[in-house]
Amino acid sequence: MKSLLVCLVLAVVVLVASGHHVELCKKNDAELKEALTCITSKLPAALGCNDKSCVFEKLCKEGDLDEALKKHFTEAEVQTLHTTATDCDHSHGHEHSHGHEHGHGHH
């Protein structure tokens, strides 16, 4: 289930990434929640879907989010997504630290 959530988050971020990512990262929690609610409400239409489960299916069914994104977004937008996600992840790294034990590598 976690991978589905990650996929949705990335899908939301990619729609924001084409120009508003800096502003999005500066929003407070209430503003961010409102923006994400608006974006997720537009996700189905953007992908030609009628509901969010269709969005999940379109973006996640191939198991390769990059490939799925490239079908719906330009290379530049996909690259912006990665940059934005990385920047935001670093600024909120403490929220994503669980389960990532450094030094105990799984080789």
From Swiss-Prot:
Name one cellular component (GO) term. Answer: extracellular region
Residue ranges annotated as transmembrane are none
MF (Gene Ontology): copper chaperone activity; iron ion binding; metal chelating activity
Q: Which cysteines are joined by disulfide bonds?
A: 25-60, 38-88, 49-54
Q: Which residues form a coiled coil?
A: none
Q: Where is composition skewed (Basic and acidic residues) in this entry?
A: 87-107
Q: Where is the signal peptide?
A: 1-19
Disordered, as annotated region: 86-107
S-adenosyl-L-methionine among keywords: no
Instruction: Say if the entry is tagged with keyword DNA-binding.
Output: no
**UniProt GO BP:** defense response to fungus; defense response to Gram-positive bacterium; innate immune response; killing of cells of another organism
Indicate where this protein resides in the cell: Secreted
Q: Keywords in alphabetical order, please.
A: Antibiotic, Antimicrobial, Copper, Disulfide bond, Fungicide, Immunity, Innate immunity, Metal-binding, Secreted, Signal
Q: What does the protein in this record do?
A: Has bacteriostatic activity against Gram-positive bacteria, but not against Gram-negative bacteria. Has fungistatic activity against some but not all fungi. Binds and sequesters copper and iron ions. Copper-chelating is crucial for antimicrobial activity against M.luteus.
Protein name as it appears in the record: Antimicrobial peptide microplusin
- Which organism is this entry from? Ixodes scapularis (Black-legged tick)
